[in-house]
From Swiss-Prot:
CDD domains: AAA, Bac_DnaA_C
NCBIfam families linked to this entry: DnaA
GO MF entries: ATP binding; ATP hydrolysis activity; DNA replication origin binding; lipid binding
InterPro entries named among the record's database cross-references: AAA+_ATPase (IPR003593), Chromosome_initiator_DnaA (IPR001957), Chromosome_initiator_DnaA-like (IPR020591), Chromosome_initiator_DnaA_CS (IPR018312), DnaA_C (IPR013159), DnaA_dom (IPR013317), DnaA_N_dom (IPR024633), DnaA_N_sf (IPR038454)
Organismal lineage: Bacteria, Pseudomonadati, Pseudomonadota, Gammaproteobacteria, Vibrionales
Record region (Domain I, interacts with DnaA modulators): 1-84
Keyword Heme: no
GO biological process, one term: DNA replication initiation
Region (Domain III, AAA+ region): 132-348
Subunit and interaction comment: Oligomerizes as a right-handed, spiral filament on DNA at oriC.
Protein name in the entry: Chromosomal replication initiator protein DnaA
Family that this chain belongs to: Belongs to the DnaA family.
Native organism: Vibrio vulnificus (strain YJ016)
This protein's UniProt keywords: ATP-binding, Cytoplasm, DNA replication, DNA-binding, Lipid-binding, Nucleotide-binding
One annotated Gene Ontology cellular component of this protein: plasma membrane
Amino acid sequence: MSSSLWLQCMQRLQEELPATEFSMWVRPLQAELNDNTLTLFAPNRFVLDWVRDKYLNSINRLLQEYCGHDIPNLRFEVGSRPMAAPKPAPTRTPADVAAESSAPAQLQARKPVHKTWDDDAQAIADINHRSNVNPKHKFNNFVEGKSNQLGLAAARQVADNPGGAYNPLFLYGGTGLGKTHLLHAVGNAIVDNKPNAKVVYMHSERFVQDMVKALQNNAIEEFKRYYRSVDALLIDDIQFFANKERSQEEFFHTFNALLEGNQQIILTSDRYPKEISGVEDRLKSRFGWGLTVAIEPPELETRVAILMKKAEDHQIHLADEVAFFIAKRLRSNVRELEGALNRVIANANFTGRPITIDFVREALRDLLALQEKLVTIDNIQKTVAEYYKIKVADLLSKRRSRSVARPRQLAMALAKELTNHSLPEIGDAFGGRDHTTVLHACRKIEQLREESHDIKEDYSNLIRTLSS
């Protein structure tokens, strides 16, 4: 009963939730129904708290729908569903024993032995594992926001249960959004939990260079042993494998060996796996075997939080209105924000002047002028029209077909996000529409970005194009 009831609930939740959310939070849950109590087992405290906070009402609604007045009590626990007691083995007769002992040795197959995370990997004497994990990048100095929330949650779960949570974990998004920080944070957390763990971080080009050197020095077997003996392999910018057939071939076999051994793989890219050109389909397919999560450009609140955190790290007081002023004007990525703040702080140190909005405007005048020149409502309209292969006139027209209305709503939302224009000004620029129409468009796109992978991708792509 517990399995069928929870299976029904899961099927409905899968229909209602975005695929990434369902895979990350609901799929790992196990259920047991006992004495009219349905216990849901979560793999760790983080998942338990998240599910209880975000999905409790939905689960209770479905239980009431399926059970009516006999709705079971709902409990949450960290752990796994208790295993059923094994059935007693049948009594073996002397004839059975004799038959087994007389069977040919090759037919007495051994079960494959898989490496578990708690096993101590045998050290390879002739290979010195170079971690390359940056100790400065930790989870506690990664600023969380809606744009990176799922990626951060997945990274934490992998760090808590490497090889067993999501394998591989594939993070993708534009430059400077925090993917590399998360890779290092996972590596640091794994080593903190298990100091003798072999964790290797590298850029994909380093993998290629190592393989070329191994081939030149007739040391390809050592190369294979090195990469296949790690506990966690963290590879940045996997898209640089494009058109490198020999490297892809070797990585394909390394990937398979690590997964078979329950060794963790985390990959990052600037685009969704299937969109990486020049990479074999069999590799792209494997990239999606675990969990694939988008890291999006930070929204305004996250940009402000990043600036405040970085200023605190520099022991600099940054007024809220100053942080908001910078964050409102620099939108593309975290790296750009940090660079701008470093420039402001350096100017303040050189001149001894307090950091005010006027001072920031002066210190960043060329950067701000470039940004304002690049992102205008006119530019947004042209970019969106080109992206969706429609005319700018369509965006300004009264047409309501979805092929026009959705791009129009996206363009309005982008204008609100990327410019300093008011809602009435944006509405006026879109064929004289009312400000309430613009507000509705912004809210609709925000909702669709949560529900639709395609809309989320389109929005991120347009942000990157307009901010680059």
